[in-house]
């Protein structure tokens, strides 16, 4: 347990940030899940619309250090590639 007042304050701040980060991570995962479901159903138009919403979510999560920027880029790339395969 924290002994100094600054350590106690840091613990409180971490708890608040954890709640915010979990919320943002859940929102990001939900956006990705919608894209994946549209791809699985074979609906290219729905997948494109969902991807337009998911890509900014991923990039903002990377910008806020919720996920690593390479992880976000990799997810965007893989989803885009799967959507492109639907057109063929």
UniProtKB/Swiss-Prot annotation:
GO cellular component terms, A-Z: cytosol; small ribosomal subunit
Tell me the organism.
Answer: Rhodopseudomonas palustris (strain BisB18)
An example molecular function term from Gene Ontology annotations: structural constituent of ribosome
The name this protein goes by in its record: Small ribosomal subunit protein bS20
- GO biological process terms, semicolon-separated: translation
Coiled-coil segments: none
**Homology family:** Belongs to the bacterial ribosomal protein bS20 family.
Q: Name one Pfam family in it.
A: Ribosomal_S20p
Q: Which SUPFAM superfamilies match?
A: Ribosomal protein S20
Matches recorded under PANTHER family: 30S RIBOSOMAL PROTEIN S20 (PTHR33398), SMALL RIBOSOMAL SUBUNIT PROTEIN BS20C (PTHR33398:SF1)
- Name the gene: rpsT
* Disulfide bond residue pairs: none
**Keywords, alphabetical:** Ribonucleoprotein, Ribosomal protein, RNA-binding, rRNA-binding
Organism classification: Bacteria, Pseudomonadati, Pseudomonadota, Alphaproteobacteria, Hyphomicrobiales
Tagged with keyword Nuclease: no
């Amino acid at each position: 347990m924290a002994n100094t007042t600054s350590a106690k304050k840091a613990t409180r701040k971490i708890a608040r940030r954890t709640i915010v980060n979990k919320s943002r991570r859940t929102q990001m995962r939900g956006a990705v899940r919608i894209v994946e479901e549209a791809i699985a159903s074979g609906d290219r138009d729905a997948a494109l619309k969902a991807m337009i919403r998911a890509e900014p979510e991923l990039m903002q999560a990377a910008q806020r250090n919720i996920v690593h920027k390479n992880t976000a880029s990799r997810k965007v790339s893989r989803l885009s590639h799967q959507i492109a395969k639907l057109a063929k």
